[in-house]
Amino acid sequence: MAVFATQRLYIGGGYVDATSGETFDTLDPATGETLASVQQASAADVDRAVRSAKQGQREWAALTAMQRSRILRRAVDLLRERNDELAALETRDTGKPIAETLAVDIVTGADVIEYYAGLATAIEGQQIPLRPTSFVYTRREPLGVCAGIGAWNYPIQIACWKSAPALAAGNAMIFKPSEITPLSALKLAEIFTEAGVPAGVFNVVQGDGRVGAMLAAHPDIEKISFTGGVETGKKVMSMAGASSLKEVTMELGGKSPLLVFDDANLERAADIATSANFFSSGQVCTNGTRVFVQRGVLDRFEALVLERVKRIRVGKPTDAATNFGPLVSAAQLHKVLGYIESGKQEGARLVAGGKRLTEGHFAGGQYVEPTVFADCRDDMRIVREEIFGPVMSILVFDDEDEAIARANHTAYGLAAGVVTENLARAHRVIHRLEAGICWINTWGESPAEMPVGGYKQSGVGRENGITTLEHYTRIKSVQVELGPYQPVF
């Protein structure tokens, strides 16, 4: 029997039944227990959501920027008031440790909405003089109806990241969460409605990739913001362009390098590498999974990482002491185990982990040990391909130029990091790394103020930061003539 009632769609400010007649189950990754049956949206449901969004968007855009800002701030207050209950729901649906969801997922999502609520009143145009009797002014106008397609690793945070700039700029958003973690986006919809966001301005349509394709191809949607894998992102981008030349934002995969130089504080470097690989059980798109270590400090670094891996507390996500939970699904577990086996077969040396955990309370869950491979080569699958799990690959390098060249030798370009005590080297290397998000002597923080996104096949456009708000508007140019019109004929 499911823990929660059947989950419906959220359209027009309230819950409605899907017309498809289809449902799917969402499971607790820690136990395998069915959390809820979720209704699958049909094409008719997507059309209904679009009609609702168009109507709501007109009302929302007609408000002043200050009015929109106040409503979004009320939503922030509600998110923070309900942080603990939302974190508990997110833990059940994703398998993340409660210590993590309490401190990160809802907190950072609320921060982003608060950030854009503050920027809503700063949207402005320009005045451009042409001559004494004529000038141009520009207006930044909302796009209209936008769609967000979320990933399963940060369900409510991603919903906040995508909806905040869209709504602040006067748009409506139809959001499709991942079918693997579909619960918390509905709670965000409830909160937006309670805060005073007009009906239809934030709709949630549940379902698998068919629903994402419907959104990408819909002619009345002006923009798609997608978070997920590269291959799916390419399909979404193709459909978005072919249907109506939609604007797109793509936050895709990565195989990010972390460079540890021989002058680094190795204790700090080991802390950074461990966090960059095992936070959220390694299910983070920016993970620094390719750890390049300068030869002279390789053995010491490896020993320090092993010390830290031994301190990781794998356990029930609901236990406050746990800091490493299960993978999100059986499919993800088997994918990760397949990569671990590949690493062994290709000759990498297993330093730590590598096995599924099945004893005791791990029996029903999707648990795998934090895994570290050393003696890795650039041509190994575990080094080349995104695993999206707790698998660290340690590689050795001799000099700066070599490290940079190898770090950049990838189709991805999402994130990169450098650990060194040499300030000049830190900036010199970072400036040559082909990645959109970079860290020096730290890893992983993505505050609301910081634009995040990738180079190469890791994405298009950015999320967060001022620049993202601009991409949820379009510019209208208006020329005004104060003098007589000069006829051509």
UniProtKB/Swiss-Prot annotation:
- What are this entry's molecular-function GO terms? betaine-aldehyde dehydrogenase (NAD+) activity; metal ion binding
Judged by the first EC level, this protein's enzyme class is: oxidoreductase
Feature type site, description Seems to be a necessary countercharge to the potassium cations: 247
Residues with PTM Cysteine sulfenic acid (-SOH): 285
* Positions contributing to NAD(+) binding: 150-152, 176-179, 229-232, 253, 285, 386
EC number annotated for this UniProt entry:
1.2.1.8
Q: Which gene encodes it?
A: betB
UniProt protein name: Betaine aldehyde dehydrogenase
> What does the UniProt keyword field contain?
Metal-binding, NAD, NADP, Oxidation, Oxidoreductase, Potassium
> Any binding details for the cofactor?
Binds 2 potassium ions per subunit.
Cofactor(s) required for function per UniProt: K(+)
What do we know about how this protein assembles, alone or with others?
Answer: Dimer of dimers.
